[in-house]
Amino acid sequence: MTDLKTWGQALDYTIKTRDEWQPHRKGSKPAITYATHFSNYNPQGRRFLIKDFNKAMMETYISELRVYRELADQTLNHCIQNIQTVLNHCIDMGVLAYQNNRHKWITGEGKFKFTKLRLTKQPRITLSPAQVDQFYAAAKNCFNQESLADTVMLSAWTGLGWAEFSQLTPSDIHLDAPVPFIAVGEREGFTLKTTHRKRRIYLPSGSDGYNKLMPILSRNLESCTDPEIQIFGDLFTSQDAHRVKFNDVRDYLQLDEKLTPYCLRHTFNTWLANLDVHPAKAHKMMGHASMKTTMEYYTHINDDQVIEAYSRLTAAA
């Protein structure tokens, strides 16, 4: 077999021939997913030339995944590792030549070795309920962006990110149920990041979530003429377009420039932690694959919250 030229060729070859990536092997699916991110999110896609891999290109790619796809550093390291795995597997199999080891991203053996990110605990940017209300009002009244305002309120009070709320159709919204709920991942064709993301978002009558979201959901359902149309996703051309409008309001309100739409999902989990919702319940409500991810929100409790918890202790506890 002649030397491979493009990323797509290398990826296909690795998926076909690498034993660790076969369907029966544990970890094969996420490894392929992380590697495939490069096909989806670099401008040339699968046609990207292997000869063009270098340090500067990888840093740009990872920066864009972090900023525009809002991936965590640990996830980004998985992406780096599995790009490297694809390229080095092809070298090991003799279908890709050893590389020029004068470059810093090439080992002495002529294989690829890209620098991974140093994992540091980043402070989470979150909003208070009052700030969410302020954001909603500014988006709706100052920018005439009611659709943006709706998604901000929805995300903050449900923990739904773009990938989930942009897929919602009328069939996912059950306002006439004894306890109204939003079904996430129950409908055929609803794409989930992991199976853990399949869940129901309940809106108990009289709760703040109910009072905030019922008018929004009812209004959007009434304006939906097609039961298969995406209630919120069709209001924006893309996730990037949604983010641009979000950033306009964020900057107008002089909020932290690191605040992104995905921070509203962090906001929801932080509210749960601040209200002492049991971690097991929060884990299910968020749809996290790992309890460790949920527990990270419970390690950012400040002294005032600890004091308030002590104040609730009684002899009847």
Each language-model region and where it sits:
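N-terminal DNA-binding recognition helix of tyrosine site-specific recombinases/integrases
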Residues: 34-41, 69-111, 161-163
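Short, polar N-cap/turn motifs at the start of nucleic acid-interacting alpha helices
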Residues: 173-179, 277-297
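Basic, Lys/Arg- and aromatic-enriched nucleic-acid-binding interface segment
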Residues: 77, 81, 92, 105-162, ...
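Basic/aromatic-enriched alpha-helical hairpins
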Residues: 2-70
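Catalytic-site neighborhood detector that most strongly recognizes the C-terminal catalytic loop/helix
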Residues: 188, 286-311
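Active-site/catalytic core of tyrosine-dependent DNA strand-transfer enzymes
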Residues: 132, 204-256
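Conserved tyrosine-mediated DNA breakage-rejoining catalytic core shared by Y-recombinases
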Residues: 167-212
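DNA breakage-rejoining catalytic core of tyrosine-based enzymes
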Residues: 51, 113-137, 190-205, 225-226
